[in-house]
Amino acid sequence: MEYGSVGYSKSDYARTLAATLGWFLNGQGDAVGLFTFDAEVREYLPARHRHGHLRQLMLALEKQGGGSETNLNAPLRRVSELIRKRGLVVLISDLLAPVNELEPSLGRLTAAGNEVILFQVLDPNELNFDFHNAMLFQDVESERDLYLDPDAIRPEYQRKLAEHSEGVENICRRLGISFHRAVTNRPLELALSDFLRSRGSRGKIVRRRAQRGGAGA
């Protein structure tokens, strides 16, 4: 999450998006909590709506990540244990983890009755692999150096990225999760618009189900 080619990192974008959504939901009178994680949960603020809580949340988001490898499985298991009431869970991550690890991790949240909205944060260079000269690439999470010819590996890279993205979206459809891709050169207002549309669509689905249930009673 520490990679960035647009003047700021994916982590910076994700924290700003989380702060924006937290401020918006708090302004609506909703209780808002926070989890930050890499290979484990780093910060946990239970959902609350009281004086000073939003400031605590913003201060927690200002802390820089450790840069270690992201692992969704252990943190999301812990999150599902800590959330006591059903509610809205917004997950913001680059999701660059094996697809077969994502479904059980996300499934714990939906199985508990939570509404889940997922933002996959990617840098534009990760989508296009817009490099042209052979060079050393550093995996910013594992810190491994790899000497690669971008033109030679671009087709294979893009094929694997497309397969990974399709796998993530299929998992979200199966679990009833609203999925959005947030590219870091995209204005945050558009991500907020995606969030609002997700909530609006969810409300329509719930109302339709309620109406059908009432008619059959």
Predicted regions and their residues:
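Exposed, interaction-prone extracellular/peripheral surfaces
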Residues: 1-217
